[in-house]
Every structure is written in C-alpha cells, then in structure tokens.
C-alpha cells in the first residue's frame, strides 16, 4: 500500500542556493529511503510523506459440528491460525528545521523533525490461534437457546514518528520516545442467547446476554504539548462490556407488523495505565510521567494520565439504543398500499475513552478534547402504493427536526461537529424490470 500525501500550504518564499531570510528550504525526502518521488518537492510543500506498507497474511481455519442429540443438541468447535508479516518504509518530511536553509539538489531533510522509516527497520510478525465454541439446544423446533465463546483481534502496525523525543522532565531531559509500533488488541466474547418463533410463528423474539473483554486497546494520541504534533498509536486500556440486546417482530393481524429492537450495555475501563517515562538516563525512567517542563527543566506543569481512570466508559458507546416501527399493508382495487411509522433513540456517549478535558483550559497541551454527545430521538414516517411493476412513496425523516452531533472533534484546533441530517421530506418512484 503506497501513500503519497503533500500538504501544499507554505506561503513563505523558498531559499535559493544562498539563503536570505525570511525563506524556507524546499523540503526533500530522506536520502536512501524507499520512495516513489525522491528529492525536492514543490516550493509550497510544508509536509510530505512518501511511504509504503506491506502486510502478508497466511491463515487457515477448521470448524466441526457434532450432534450430541440429533436435531436437538449440537456442539461446534472451530479455530483459526493466523500469521501476519508487517513492514513499512519511506520518508516523512517536515519543513520544521528548514527555515533559512539554502537549496540543495536533495532538498531539505532535517532528521530532528523528519523521519526516515527505512532507518527504523519497521518489520514484525504476529501469529497465533483464535478460536470459537458454541452449544446450541433446540428445546422445541421453534425455541432455541445457545452459548457462544469467541475470540477476535485487530492487527498492530507502525508509527511514522517512532523514536522522536518529547515531554522534557525536571532534569532537562526528554521523558518520552514515541513508540515505533503498536501491538494487536484482543476481544474475548461470552454470550448466551435465544431465538424463538411463537404463537404459530406470528411472534419472533430473539435476544442475547453478553460480556466482552477488550484488552490492550489501540489508542491514538495527538498531544502537541507533551508528545509532539504528529498522531501516533499505542496500546493502553482494558475494557469490560456487559449488555443485553433483543428484537421482536409481531404480526399482530393481517397486514399489521410491529417491530422493536433495543440494546443496553455497560462499558467499564478495568485498568489504569499511564504514560511511562521510557527514555533511559532520565530521572524518572520507568515511572509515570506526571509533569512536563521547559527545555531547561524549569517551569514544570502537572499532566495527568491520558488513558483515563478506572471505571471510565469506552468511546462512542451509548448505554441505550432502541427503535420501534409499525407497518400496515393492504390491497384495494389491485393496488398494494402501505403506511409506516417509526421512532429510534440513541443515548448519550463520549467521543473518547481517555481523560482529556471537555473544555479548553489554560495550559492545555492537547487539541484532542473529550466531548459528551447528547442523546437524540428520531421519528420517521412513510406512505406508498404499488401496482404491477410501478411503485411510489412519500417519506419524511427526522420528523421532529432533532438537532444533535453524532461526532465532535477538535483535532484541527476548531470544534468540528457531524450533525444529524435535518428534517427531510421526499418522494420516490420505482419501476421493476
């Protein structure tokens, strides 16, 4: 996978072969790096990354079903072996460190602010087994209960700014080196559920109770005041998620169908990791970073753990969601008609699982703030008619014109919100061929 991204917004003039400030040297790629466009970039390039990433995956799986009691009690066992070989290389170049630098045939590449990924030897391998077990019991032909145990994971990867030093301590030395890579995180699921069809199949009721353990969770950091002005990923929290979900479909009478589904879950951080001083020789090496100072080790300011305290909820995880819908269909004079209405609700959630503040404060070191997303309710309705291969419908979405943000971020130093779609009224026409 190749990635070439060029941020062309520099307005200062470029330096010539003899630098006369104010000017910037034209940035170039890391010497000897594996890039597709080597050498100097455009005169207005402020940042440029020319990288590639390769993942080789080998996997095989097996699954066996065995009827302990034919058509009544079945056991399923399965496993998957995986092997990932990951590697990355290339150049990530910044115009920092290029102010007043004379032009050269190779372009300006300052290793204090830019990164030669080839020199970091970014390669690793992961392998192992992830398995699944299931027991299914058909109490009757229309009532089934089950238990499932399953495992999953998300592969790790590399950071483009690995090894860069930040967070000066009271001894004047950096306390944190950005990690070159991050590991996979893992999910273990235990679930008990049921599936039923009752009252001559006029009522369908399904549901499940579950507990998920999500460990070594991958998390992205962007904290210019502590860990530099480039995103990097690492591993941190463990979460336990417990919940219940259910759905009902009821054919109340000919033509009338009611549907409802809902889920409640409680997510909780079960550990309390910290950002650890990982620079040998620094005064607090191996301990949690609790303060950041100026370059001389003076004027220190306290910093908290960005991972958040034990008991915090996971990100973007509303504790309650539900929807209810009713649909009535009938026929008159060869026309198939319907009317439908529904309501859905999403409870509040948080944009991050960490401990970042919800409002900008004096001395704040990060632009990645934590926001609470307000709960919202949506109402929709539609009516339609069809005959032969033609159909038409009238619909309205977000009937109450609810206003809420589905995601809020300050990563770009301004508050950005993704709003709900406003009330929308429309007409559709269709023809089947």
Enumerate the language-model features and the residues they cover.
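Transmembrane beta-barrel strands of outer-membrane/channel proteins
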Residues: 1-4, 77-83, 145-151, 194, ...
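C-terminal beta-signal and adjacent terminal beta-strands/loops
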Residues: 255, 333, 343-361, 384-433
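Outer-membrane beta-barrel channels and translocator barrels
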Residues: 69-73, 140, 187, 199-201, ...
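Solvent-exposed loop segments that connect transmembrane elements
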Residues: 10-50, 86-124, 157-181, 219-235, ...
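Gram-negative outer-membrane beta-barrel transporters
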Residues: 208-213, 232-354, 428-432
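Membrane-embedded beta-barrel scaffold of Gram-negative outer-membrane proteins
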Residues: 138, 144-154, 161, 174, ...
